[in-house]
């Protein structure tokens, strides 16, 4: 690669240092790719400097046309910023696009953006919109559209989880002047300044942060961060305006969604005429039957109970990828039963994570360590493995005033079925320390009514390319997706420090403190990391299993 130090410094002052660390063996190729592209180096240049060939999308089949049908839950899609699962976003992303895209290789590239540029201190990010992108109504995408979306995402009235990714950087807490039932001040969130999101010109937006933030490109691909046309007033549905390769022509909640290829797409024209998402319900056997009979051509994602059956279906290929997908039994620390951190740690020590992985996920993945940072994350720090320790768990319960244990209830979903299997295996292990947990297995649609309410519940969390992302989303004080109601100023400060630390090795040292804090005082029992897989008919070309189970139908053909 012919880029010299001056060329690299024009992109970002830290890039020459990254190249040196790569050459000296202090930074592996994977971390170099992720970090250099985050600073604005093109993926092609980063791969070349790393001495690797860039992954190439499989060429489209010569024949255009046809329909691909995917088995996937069809849930509400009206308000993308408050999406809380991948299903809804997989419909939206065929109609609308994101500013960036993190590929199956975990490298983030511009999508609706032409490029981004970070200031030396990572406090200012300049986003440049691609010129000439047309919405389906003929309007050209511009900076005003992007500013409208960014501002809406960070409006506390909308209630988007995106706030958690920008907390401290663009968003701050403020006292609303109201009191809660306990007499404590009710806090809200707002942009720290009316200059936080700045339109520079017709195609340029500047994010003026008050703290450093390294993960802006990845944060812009958080699945609720769909770019909508302001004329649709924030509502996505049949006939909505989009920049994507398809138009939503039919939507029936809980049954199906139909999308048709549109003319005028700014990227490479999609090969397929139509994509259909078919809802086969909670029963894993129904999706397998649909795939085996040819009613569908593939599944968004398969569960472990379907694995053996998938292997037996003719003309079906199993696609698999290592991920940071997981499930956590989160304990709400503001509920009396889980206020004492010793009780929360005892719940962790009761679990044999390797056994849960084998029982619930056929051993496909890795045992987790109760801190929600995965081995696939660049900043993961390898601690001594947290082994099951029944005696220590009982001792902690006794110290917390529960020498005979206690009774409680855990809520979980029926689909995907591995979740209830994992919970069942943990329930049996908790019995060994005198904690009797009743399982309440709900239909998936009903679970989300209990998600933020119950003291103990098991929630599936999807993959994120950086460990700091999921921690910011789930455990920062007051963020919308903080299902455990966890509030720890020390963790908040450590996350702010990690978010501002570009150097992977230095960030890993910060993450060590975070991981230890989560194991000692945190609000979760986390048994496993999942390898994600699915089955797809061989006739579907161009499909790649994404670690977040995202689907990109414009890449497929027959």
Per-range role (PLM):
Residues 364-399, 414-421:
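Structural transition elements
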Residues 71-120, 239-243:
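N-terminal lobe/hinge region of extracytoplasmic solute-binding protein
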Residues 198, 345, 433-447, 470-538:
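Extracytoplasmic/peripheral linker and loop segments enriched in polar/acidic and small residues
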Residues 70, 138, 301, 422, ...:
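Periplasmic binding protein-like
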Residues 154-158, 215-217, 308-309, 319-320, ...:
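Periplasmic-binding protein-like
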Residues 102-107, 179-198, 202-204, 208-276, ...:
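Gly/Pro-rich hinge or "lid" segments in bacterial periplasmic/extracellular proteins
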Residues 1-31, 50, 54-55:
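N-terminal secretory signal peptides
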Residues 534-558:
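Long beta-strand-rich cores associated with HINT superfamily self-processing modules
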């Amino acid at each position: 690669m012919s880029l010299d130090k001056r060329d690299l410094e024009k992109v970002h002052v830290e890039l020459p240092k990254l190249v040196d660390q790569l050459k000296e063996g202090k930074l592996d190729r994977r971390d170099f790719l992720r970090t250099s592209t985050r600073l604005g180096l093109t993926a092609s240049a980063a791969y070349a400097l790393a001495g690797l060939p860039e992954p190439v999308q499989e060429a489209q089949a010569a024949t255009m046309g046809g329909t691909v049908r995917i088995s996937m839950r069809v849930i509400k899609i009206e308000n993308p910023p408050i999406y809380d699962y991948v299903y809804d976003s997989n419909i939206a992303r065929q109609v609308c696009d994101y500013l960036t895209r993190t590929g199956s290789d975990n490298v983030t590239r511009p999508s609706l953006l032409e490029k981004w540029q970070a200031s030396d201190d990572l406090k200012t990010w300049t986003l440049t919109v691609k010129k000439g992108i047309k919405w389906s109504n003929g309007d050209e995408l511009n900076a005003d559209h992007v500013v409208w979306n960014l501002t809406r995402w960070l409006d506390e009235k909308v209630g988007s989880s995106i706030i958690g990714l920008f907390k401290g950087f663009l968003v701050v807490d403020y006292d609303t002047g109201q009191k809660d039932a306990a007499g404590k001040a009710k806090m809200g969130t707002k942009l720290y300044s009316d200059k936080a999101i700045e339109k520079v010109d017709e195609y340029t937006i500047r994010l003026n942060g008050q703290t450093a933030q390294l993960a802006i490109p990845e944060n812009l691909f958080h699945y609720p961060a769909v770019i909508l046309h302001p004329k649709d007033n924030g509502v996505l549905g049949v006939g909505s305006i989009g920049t994507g390769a398809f138009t939503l022509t039919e939507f029936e909640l809980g049954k199906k969604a139909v999308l048709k290829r549109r003319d005028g797409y700014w990227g490479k024209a999609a090969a397929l005429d139509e994509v259909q998402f078919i809802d086969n319900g909670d029963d894993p056997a129904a999706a397998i039957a649909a795939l085996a009979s040819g009613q569908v051509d593939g599944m968004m994602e398969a569960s472990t109970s379907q694995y053996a059956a998938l292997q037996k279906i003719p003309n079906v290929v199993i696609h698999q990828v290592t991920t940071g997908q997981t499930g956590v039994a989160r304990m709400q620390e503001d509920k009396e039963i889980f206020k004492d951190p010793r009780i929360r740690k005892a719940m962790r020590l009761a679990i044999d994570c390797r056994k849960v992985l084998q029982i619930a996920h056929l051993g496909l993945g890795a045992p987790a360590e109760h801190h929600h940072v995965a081995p696939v994350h660049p900043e993961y720090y390898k601690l001594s493995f947290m082994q099951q320790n029944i005696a220590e768990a009982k001792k902690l319960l006794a110290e917390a005033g529960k020498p005979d244990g206690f009774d409680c209830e855990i809520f979980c979903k029926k689909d995907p079925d591995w979740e209830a299997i994992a919970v069942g295996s943990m329930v049996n292990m908790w019995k060994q320390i005198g904690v009797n947990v009743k399982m309440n297995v709900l239909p998936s649609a009903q679970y989300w009514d209990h998600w933020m309410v119950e003291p103990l519940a098991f929630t599936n969390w999807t993959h994120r390319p950086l460990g700091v992302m999921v921690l910011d989303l789930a455990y920062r004080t007051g963020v919308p997706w903080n299902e455990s109601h966890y509030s720890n100023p020390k963790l908040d400060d450590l996350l702010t420090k990690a978010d501002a630390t570009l150097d992977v090795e230095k960030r890993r040292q910060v993450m060590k403190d975070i991981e230890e804090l989560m194991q000692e005082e945190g609000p979760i029992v986390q048994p496993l990391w999942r390898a994600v897989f699915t089955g797809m008919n061989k006739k579907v070309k161009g499909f790649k299993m994404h670690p977040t189970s995202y689907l990109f139908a414009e890449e497929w053909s027959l």
